[in-house]
């Protein structure tokens, strides 16, 4: 048995027509493996002319998987979060995205930016109020880097002298340094967490997301087709408005899109996504388009369900009525225990819940599971996620009021309905990542809720499949409660919560 590397991803800046031809040639060589009589290198498989012809013929016969051997990475800078969410819903990809926790974000409008700065301060103060020791370890580390063996400790964000190891002058300098430099450092954990929560007020179409996205030559061409399927459900009302709006990235004028199905004006959400997908599809067409690699299964961006361009999407039939507001009061009355009549838990499962755009952006990183979004952008009122650290305070009303003031821009706190489906073995993998003190809070809480429903159905006898029960028992801790990541795996990451507090924290 022999092993030989035949292909390798290399770094490049831009893609030339020659590189695209090389990609097609390599795919054509792989197509020849299926029927070669001799070895790979000593046969007609690697003949350039035959390989090129073979690529075209194989693709025209509908066998496109040969183009999956070529992986192409695109760096998207200044992208919207929504475009990243759509691309990350496709499962066949690798992505590296600049984190909202470690990045000071800016909104598209002054309204968003003002709210982001305001809530970043509020969240920071609230974090320190709830967890006064949250920054202590980092504060001490930074202090000791300049003043080692100083005899000081840090407790609740304050310097505490344990031993008088410094002379009077140095001691004064050290205290001033701690107060004026270290305590003002916006890279402290509390500030990073504040930034992570403040991004909820920014539009899902805030163009400050940067990520590298890798997938195959085939998939890039399918993405082009799915972009076109979304785009082709709309038509600009006036061509000149469309041109002006497109050239200025939506900063000048207004472009009105009309649905070809209903004649109704497209919402802000639909219009922004239209231009995002238009720009992406234009880039693909200019750099990676291969005529023979058209999607021959008539698919779409399944994640978008009824917004995908498929007028009567099959997932439209999933019962989500339990998440609708009360017809009289307008209140949302569902609880974490709420289940749709279509939810099912077994070896394969499907479950529904509501989630913010921030949450679903995290959830999609579990690529072995599939997610479907249900969102009506034309509703006059939307539900918003409220960070648990605000619950029970006067901030809740202010938070909701501020979000309502920018609701037309679709802030990332906007909640949508999600249907999650997959195999329980893959859900276990999700639990091993997300039932953790380091995981984003909203997805950690929902993962815990879904795990609890599996345990409930085993305990009640609703799940009888022995294989499924064996998987579910992996989630059960010694006390019968849900295990955390550090109890399921040998976790080496630093964490201030531990297994005891990971699932009950408020930040």
Regions found by a protein language model. Give the residues of each.
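A conserved ligand/cofactor-binding region detector
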Residues: 1-507
């Amino acid at each position: 048995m022999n092993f030989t590397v035949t292909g390798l991803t290399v770094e490049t800046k831009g893609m030339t027509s020659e590189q695209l031809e090389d990609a097609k040639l390599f795919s054509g060589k792989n197509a020849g493996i299926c029927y070669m009589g001799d070895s790979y290198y000593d046969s007609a498989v690697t003949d350039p002319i035959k390989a090129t012809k073979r690529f075209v013929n194989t693709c025209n016969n509908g066998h496109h998987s040969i183009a999956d051997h070529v992986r192409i990475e695109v760096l998207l800078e200044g992208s919207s979060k929504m475009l990243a969410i759509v691309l990350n819903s496709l499962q066949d990809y690798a992505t590296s995205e600049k984190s909202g926790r470690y990045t000071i974000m800016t909104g598209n409008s002054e309204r968003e930016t003002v709210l982001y700065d305001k809530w970043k301060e509020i969240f920071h103060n609230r974090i320190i109020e709830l967890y006064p020791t949250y920054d202590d370890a980092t504060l001490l580390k930074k202090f000791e880097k300049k003043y080692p063996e100083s005899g000081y400790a840090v407790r609740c964000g304050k310097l505490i002298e344990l031993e008088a190891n410094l002379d009077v002058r140095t001691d004064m300098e050290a205290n001033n340094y701690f107060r004026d430099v270290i305590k003002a450092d916006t890279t402290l954990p509390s500030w990073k967490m504040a930034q992570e929560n403040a991004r909820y007020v920014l539009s899902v179409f805030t163009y400050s997301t940067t990520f590298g996205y890798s997938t195959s030559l085939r998939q890039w061409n399918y993405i082009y087709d799915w972009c076109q399927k979304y785009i082709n459900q709309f038509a600009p009302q006036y061509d000149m408005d469309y041109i002006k709006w497109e050239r200025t990235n939506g900063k000048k004028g207004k472009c009105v899109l009309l649905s070809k199905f209903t004649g109704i004006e497209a919402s802000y959400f639909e219009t922004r996504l239209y231009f995002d997908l238009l720009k992406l599809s234009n880039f693909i067409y200019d750099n990676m388009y291969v005529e023979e690699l058209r999607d021959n299964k008539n698919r779409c961006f399944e994640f978008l369900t009824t917004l995908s361009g498929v007028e009567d999407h099959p997932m439209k039939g999933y019962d989500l009525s339990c998440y609708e507001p009360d017809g009289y009061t307008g209140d949302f009355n569902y609880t974490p225990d709420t289940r749709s009549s279509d939810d099912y838990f077994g070896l394969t499962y499907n479950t529904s819940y509501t989630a913010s755009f921030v949450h679903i952006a995290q959830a999609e990183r579990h690529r072995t599971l599939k997610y479907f979004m249900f969102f009506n952008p034309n509703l006059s009122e939307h539900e918003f996620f409220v960070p648990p650290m605000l619950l029970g305070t006067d901030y809740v009303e202010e938070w909701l009021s501020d979000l309502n003031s920018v609701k037309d821009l679709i802030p990332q706190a906007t909640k949508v309905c999600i249907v999650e489906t997959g195999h329980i073995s893959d859900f276990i993998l999700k639990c091993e990542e997300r039932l953790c003190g380091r995981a984003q809070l909203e997805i950690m809480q929902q993962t815990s809720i879904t795990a609890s429903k599996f345990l409930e159905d085993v305990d009640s006898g609703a799940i009888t499949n022995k294989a499924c029960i064996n998987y579910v028992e992996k989630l059960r801790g010694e006390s019968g409660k849900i295990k955390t990541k550090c109890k399921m795996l040998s976790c080496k990451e630093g964490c201030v919560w531990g297994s005891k507090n990971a699932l009950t924290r408020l930040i």
